[in-house]
């Protein structure tokens, strides 16, 4: 197997993400751009975790034009990969979905069928490992920008996987002038 094309893809994706991080200073972007960022992240992690995860999308097409804080999905995807595959003896699938809810909000769901965790043990694990900072940061950024009616909820069950649901207001993205 020739690894040059794989490395080229990885370098290209890393370059793209570095540009998004260092050059572009937009705090809010359209969901379509966030998904593009996420795809580049998955390309990089796919090299590192070869064959350990697969990604499936079910995105409501019209939702791609709505706004989301930049890099809100990447920490959730990172947790799905790192923690979902930790004790897995087979590849996991990460599902990314978007839909509009009845209360005029946009729901973005990242769920995996990985090992999951016991929510009672989460606080102890976070203290020991220093984990959970990215997830807390995503929730705090959403609440700070949109108010406390919006944010992130996480549900997990041992042996079944984890579901992260972002709730955002239904606001069409408008390019900053």
Predicted regions span which residues?
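Two-component histidine phosphotransfer core
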Residues: 1-155, 161-167
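Short, charged/polar, Gly/Pro-enriched secondary-structure boundary elements
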Residues: 171-176
């Amino acid at each position: 197997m020739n690894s040059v094309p794989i490395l080229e893809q990885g370098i290209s994706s890393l370059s793209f993400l570095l540009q998004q991080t260092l050059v572009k200073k937009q705090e809010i972007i359209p969901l379509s751009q966030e998904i593009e960022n996420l795809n580049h992240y998955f390309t990089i992690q796919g090299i590192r975790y070869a064959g350990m995860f697969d990604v499936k999308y079910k995105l409501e097409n019209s939702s791609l034009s709505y706004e989301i804080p930049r890099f809100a999905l990447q920490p959730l995807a990172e947790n799905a990969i790192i923690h979902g595959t930790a004790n897995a003896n087979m590849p996991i699938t990460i599902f990314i979905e978007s839909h509009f809810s009845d209360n005029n909000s946009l729901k973005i769901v990242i769920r995996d069928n990985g090992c999951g965790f016991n929510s009672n043990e989460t606080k102890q694990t976070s203290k020991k490992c220093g984990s959970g900072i990215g997830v807390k940061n995503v929730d705090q950024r959403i609440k700070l920008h949109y108010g406390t009616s919006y944010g992130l909820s996480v549900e997990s069950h041992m042996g079944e996987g984890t579901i992260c649901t972002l709730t955002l207001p239904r606001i069409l993205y408008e390019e900053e002038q």
